[in-house]
Amino acid sequence: KKQGIKFHMQHKVEKIKKNNEGAVISTTDKDGNKKDFDCDVVLISVGRKPNTNGLNIEAAGIELDAKQRIKTDKNFKTNLNNIYAIGDVITGPMLAHKAEDEGIAVAENIAGQSGHVNYDTIPGVIYTTPEVASIGKTEEQLKEKNVDYKIGKFSFMANSRAKAIDDAEGFVKILADAKTDKVLGAHLIGPHAGELIAEIGVAMEFGASSEDIARTCHAHPTFSEAVKEAALSVDKRAIHS
């Protein structure tokens, strides 16, 4: 907002037409409404697809879905008993750490163990300035499923470590179930967001509540105190806000 940037969510880009001033982007929103945007520069940063071309998959008899991803079962096995698939060529987020966990799970399954990947606790990090990280559900996803939830939010402006290094832009937001207090998701913008998200991932993996995080002693002064304060804020008990 400070930079005057506006976000138009859930808009599909239909076409981009160049002109002398830059370009015109034609879009359609989720309700079917069409809108054009006049732009100086267009940066295309999305649109990845699985690199399954050239693998001669058809000759092997491996089945693909409509998006050219390799079909697998819950154990990452394809329709052929001796072939497994993981990572960017199957469904799910195209993230290196997601693929790594899937590879470990496959090895465990082949060895007769019970390999498993919890896709609800796979973090995503955007390495910008400020850094952005997220895990679990978004507010939009919870609303779509009619899940009653609480929000805890804490600004880095009130975090001593962030203030000390003059990097206090951003916040930590935690979403918790309104009835059980179970942590459902989190979103962070600010210093070391990609590192701080791990604590919330561990909490979610163990089915922790926001109070579990809030009652865990965090060293002072650290960035992680913002996570604790956000957890306290879920029940409106933040200390330094």
Region roles according to the model:
Residues 1-33, 92-100, 108-141:
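Rossmann-like dinucleotide-binding cores of NAD(P)H-dependent redox enzymes
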Residues 7, 13, 70, 149-151:
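Generic structural signal for residues in well-ordered beta-strands
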Residues 15, 61, 75, 173-175:
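Short, surface-exposed charged micro-motifs
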Residues 19-20, 66, 178-180:
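Short acidic-glycine loop/turn motifs at beta-strand connectors
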Residues 28, 64, 72, 99, ...:
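Hydrophobic alpha-helical segments, especially N-terminal targeting/anchoring helices
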Residues 36-110, 116:
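FAD-site-proximal beta/loop scaffold in flavoenzymes
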Residues 63-66, 113-121, 147-152:
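A short alpha-helix-loop-beta-strand transition element characteristic
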Residues 128-138, 143-241:
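Flexible, glycine-rich terminal cap/loop adjacent to redox cofactors
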